């Protein structure tokens, strides 16, 4: 398993800077997920690690060894793409063993390696079929099997589930997690889907405009986002953000005035390093699942339900709000959607405070 380190990595395409100083360490055996919107640099970063691109600046090390000048074939890694890239005229077994054949491995050894990988992926019965006889999920398993047979120290996945329907994506997420548990090999996975990131990763790397916004476990990113971008990107539906102003400053705390809440202000803890003064604008964030219908909570806000979304085990209520634009609340369980105006309670410990530049203050 490879321990991957990136130090000061910059990548330019002409005058465009796709990656702007990436410092990152990925422990051996970890399942690391790069997540972010389209164009954030996550696939470019994966291509640099793979060796398909060369950094404009900075270094990439595998187990302490500088990879500059080392071609992809010399990095002991395997890559799985969004496209399955299977040879249509070959059987599943021949597709999986093709790289081993090109490397000169004897046929008897190839057969053993392919059989082991097929057993792990539960596709032994498919080994004699052609790709056209397989479903999308089966083709993706073959593509993953083609990577497994090479016994790499590092797996790279570039949005491998994007071509699958919703049900198959859920199934393949489970299979990838189980594969990592069995192999304990380093894996780096690129996706724009934060659900994939949250369910698969040991550590998530959130990228935006060529920069790393935050690195942490799924729970750390969800419960303690370091800025507004991460707060909005991680979690679905996105975090509710209420605009307010600093009404008073206390030792280790801040009193925030927010129009439309009762009482009219909310006192929250403040980071010692935060530099604020009375009158400054701030935003208070609350996750939809942290809002409670009823009169409880440190403060309350009234909302008129505009529409509801029933998703089986829960219901999402949406309502316009003068400061948030729209408030969303998650109601667990099956119940009839409330109509008219309802009251929501907000607890202090559920709140996140952000400066107007997006950085976390609480």
Name each model-derived stretch.
Residues 56-59, 109, 209, 243:
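Conserved coupling/switch loops of ABC nucleotide-binding domains, chiefly the family-specific signature
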Residues 237, 248-362:
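Non-catalytic connector elements of ABC transporters
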Residues 72-229:
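ABC ATPase nucleotide-binding domains
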Residues 50:
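Helix-to-loop junction immediately C-terminal to a conserved catalytic motif
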Residues 58-66:
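Conserved ABC transporter NBD signature motif
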Residues 5, 25, 61, 343-345:
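ABC ATPase nucleotide-binding domain
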């Amino acid at each position: 398993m490879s321990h991957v380190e990136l130090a000061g990595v910059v990548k330019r395409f002409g005058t465009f800077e796709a990656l702007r100083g990436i410092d990152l360490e990925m422990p051996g055996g970890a399942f690391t997920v790069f997540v972010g919107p389209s164009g954030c640099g996550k696939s470019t970063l994966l291509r640099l690690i793979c060796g398909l691109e060369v950094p404009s600046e900075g270094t990439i090390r595998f187990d302490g060894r500088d990879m500059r000048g080392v071609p992809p074939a010399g990095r002991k890694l395997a890559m799985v793409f969004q496209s399955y890239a299977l040879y249509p005229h070959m059987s599943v077994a021949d597709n999986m063993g093709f790289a081993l054949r090109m490397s000169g491995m004897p046929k008897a050894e190839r057969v053993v390696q392919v059989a082991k990988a097929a057993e792990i992926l539960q596709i032994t019965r498919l080994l004699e079929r052609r790709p056209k006889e397989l479903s999308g999920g089966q083709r993706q398993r073959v593509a993953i099997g083609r990577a497994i047979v090479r016994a790499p120290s590092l797996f790279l996945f570039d949005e491998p589930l994007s071509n699958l329907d919703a049900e198959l994506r859920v199934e393949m997420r489970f299979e990838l997690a189980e594969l990592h548990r069995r192999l304990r090999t380093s894996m780096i996975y690129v996706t724009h889907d934060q659900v994939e990131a949250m369910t698969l990763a040991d550590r998530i790397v959130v990228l935006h405009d060529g920069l790393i916004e935050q690195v942490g476990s799924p729970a750390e990113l969800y419960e303690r986002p370091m800025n507004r971008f991460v707060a909005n990107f991680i979690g679905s539906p996105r975090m509710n953000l209420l605009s307010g102003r600093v009404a008073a400053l206390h030792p280790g705390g801040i009193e925030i005035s927010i129009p439309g809440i009762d009482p009219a202000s909310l006192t929250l803890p403040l980071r010692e390093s935060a530099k604020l003064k009375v009158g400054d604008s701030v935003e208070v964030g609350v996750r939809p699942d942290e809002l409670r219908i009823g009169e409880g909570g440190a403060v309350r806000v009234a909302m008129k339900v505009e529409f509801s979304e029933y998703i089986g085990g829960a219901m999402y209520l949406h309502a316009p709000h003068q400061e948030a634009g729209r408030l969303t609340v998650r109601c667990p369980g099956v119940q009839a959607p409330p109509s008219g105006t309802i009251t929501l309670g907000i607890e202090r410990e559920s709140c996140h405070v952000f400066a107007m530049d997006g950085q976390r203050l609480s």
